[in-house]
């Protein structure tokens, strides 16, 4: 009887070891795949920036466009700003929206566009980041608010870890977290969690207050999982950006966002890191240029 028990225990331990080892191998493969994706994204970003700087210099030398008023700093994480510059062929008077603008500079997609002469609407819910953004971006309208679906008004609560130590706590302080997750992040990284209330509105309501005079060229949506709600609040049947750059950590699996954009005749052209670039499918020339850049121009790889 004792021998049988030893055999059973040995079999169970062997099975547990096999399952654990298989999970470890799967995790290693996923981490290796993520590392390759990050390396590919960094390489694409480098190619895009080299292409854009060379193109900008050539245009300025030939007189096609005037020299830039100041050196242009491309700050985005995956070269999104450089691609937008190329996509709009160095346009100097565009209009953008950035929902989730953070401090206005860190990994900003629209900072370079404002440096070129664009203006826009920047929205940031966290009070400290809003103040930094307002100071850093004098050429645009900066609004302190959280964004929701159409008809949103009043205030909403945020659970905010006040960063004590570590980048994760600081990052968590910039985004909207559930109370449980906020407490977990705060506790894990030495931060105290507090609840704050911030103004709640929609993008369409903000645009109604100061409508863009010549349409919306670009809308950047980086709202940590609330993309579908914020897009609903933009009211795409009224305010229709030519290009949408939308963070999607599900990499296309979020049917709510995807279906809403397809229903409004947008086509996803390329992935830049975890950001999908969507172009108005009714704008034939812009869509064709975006596909050209994705297929063999400034960017190689990452097509939808």
Mark where each language-model region is.
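Phosphate/nucleotide-binding beta-alpha loop and adjacent structural elements of enzyme active sites
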Residues: 2-6, 19-304
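Alpha-helical transmembrane segments of integral membrane proteins
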Residues: 9-13
